[in-house]
Design a protein with these regions (language model features):
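Membrane-embedded beta-barrel scaffold of Gram-negative outer-membrane proteins
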Residues: 5, 25-90, 97-99, 116-118
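Structural signature of outer-membrane beta-barrel domains
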Residues: 1-7, 14, 43-45, 56-60, ...
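Hydrophobic, lipid-facing positions within transmembrane beta-strands of outer-membrane proteins
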Residues: 22, 32-36, 90-94, 137-141, ...
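Outer-membrane beta-barrel translocator domains and adjoining extracellular loop/strand segments
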Residues: 8-17, 61-69, 75, 113, ...
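C-terminal beta-signal and adjacent terminal beta-strands/loops
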Residues: 57-59, 64, 106, 159-164, ...
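Gram-negative outer-membrane beta-barrel transporters
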Residues: 55-57, 76-167, 235-239
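C-terminal beta-barrel architecture of Gram-negative outer-membrane proteins
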Residues: 17-19, 117, 132-186, 197-201, ...
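Repeated loop/turn-to-beta-strand initiation elements of outer-membrane beta-barrel proteins
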Residues: 44-49, 103-106, 149-153, 189-194
Length: 240
């Protein structure tokens, strides 16, 4: 398969910055993807699984970078998109569902990913490094139990390994694991879910910014954006 991400303009940036003037326009990114996979049902269809191997080539890869135009003024911190020549992604995806009983099924999804930045002339120091926000390992495991009177209970555990926050610096996140639970009711016309996400209120970070913001020396410091804390809510759906 082949696809592309359209190009664009870096607007609202400081036109006095030489790098910005050279990067006002960025080109489309092109992706060529190769996949090979199998799916099957085993043991009278109690076990369903799929296995996919993929390889992707990215040409004129778009990367979001950040920089502080004036080292003494944190208000000049800006973002811009550049084309980083080439990128490479490959990995494995495994999904499975197992019906342990008529009222209980278990699921497990695993992902293994390797990425690489290639031929970025303005950042040769990143040659061969993994791309940002591309954890090598990810997984989701859990189960769904159907109770009496159209009630059900679902438990899910999601996890990711560490990943680079940005293509502008080399700081990485920590691996994390989140647990979600849903208690619900469903019939042909109506459904209601009481859900708790991140039930153990784990701290984890989703983005990281590295720049100088504190006087007098404005030493580069890592600032993290926290992921969602524990959330409790209700979802209602009605079929007309």
């Amino acid at each position: 398969a082949r696809g592309y991400k359209q190009g664009g303009f870096n607007l609202g940036l400081d036109a006095t910055d030489n790098l910005v003037r050279q990067s006002l326009i960025y080109d489309p990114e092109y992706l060529t993807n190769y996949e090979f996979g199998i799916s099957s049902n085993l043991k009278d269809r109690d076990l369903n699984y799929s296995f996919v191997i993929f390889f992707s080539e990215r040409k004129d890869q778009q990367v979001l970078i950040s920089r502080q135009v004036d080292p003494t003024d944190p208000n000049t911190f800006s973002y811009l998109t550049q084309n980083a020549a080439e990128g490479e992604n490959y990995g494995i995806e495994i999904t499975s569902n197992y019906f342990l009983r008529d009222d209980l099924y278990l699921f497990a999804n695993l992902g293994f990913l390797k990425t690489k930045i290639k031929n970025w002339e303005s950042r040769i120091d990143l040659e061969g490094r993994s791309q940002a926000h591309a954890p090598e390992h990810s997984y989701s495991i859990g189960g769904n139990l159907n109770l009496k009177n159209n009630l059900y209970l679902k438990l899910e555990i999601n996890g990711k390994s560490s990943f680079y926050y940005s293509d502008s610096h080399d700081n990485q996140s920590k691996s994390y694991q989140l647990t979600n639970i849903i208690f619900g009711y469903s019939n042909s016309d109506f459904s209601a879910d009481l859900w708790i996400r991140n039930i153990f209120n784990k701290y984890y970070s989703t983005r990281g910014f590295y720049f100088g913001n504190e006087a007098p020396n404005f030493i580069d410091t890592l600032y993290r954006r926290q992921g969602d804390p524990r959330n409790i809510g209700i979802s209602l759906r009605y079929n007309f």
